[in-house]
Amino acid sequence: MALRGVNMPLATVASEAIAERVWLKMGLKEEDIRAFFTGPAHLPWHRMGNLNGWDGPLTDGWQKEQIKLQHKILNRMRELGMEPIAPAFAGFVPTAFAERHPEIQFKHLEWGGFDEKYNAYVLPPETPYFKEIGKLFIEEWEKEFGKNTYYL
């Protein structure tokens, strides 16, 4: 990629491991967090907010290996002069978070004809939780992987 002029690649590996840390800090139980993530093959759809829980959960081993892999990826990107674009909080929340906050009007998405239990909830950006979770996500990411300039 670097040889072809790509200098700002996405670096989304291990974003679920970082999100898990954030949700634990927000008071969710591990089993509720694990029920939120899809299996590895479906993570692109999970990250886009299309699908939750399908073919999951992710194991502790998976999360640890993703953290190791992301360190290697980021080191190499930086060696090649690339500026990684890291993930940020996009507003998708576990069902357990939505259930804990009935005072918030979450948007409940539907996608691909999947049963309601697999659909995502979106936290409205005007709520104080959006900023709090977003800040926690970046703090956790930078604590693990170091300072970053660009987030998506």
Where are these regions (language model features)?
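Aromatic-lined carbohydrate-binding surfaces of glycoside hydrolases
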Residues: 2-152
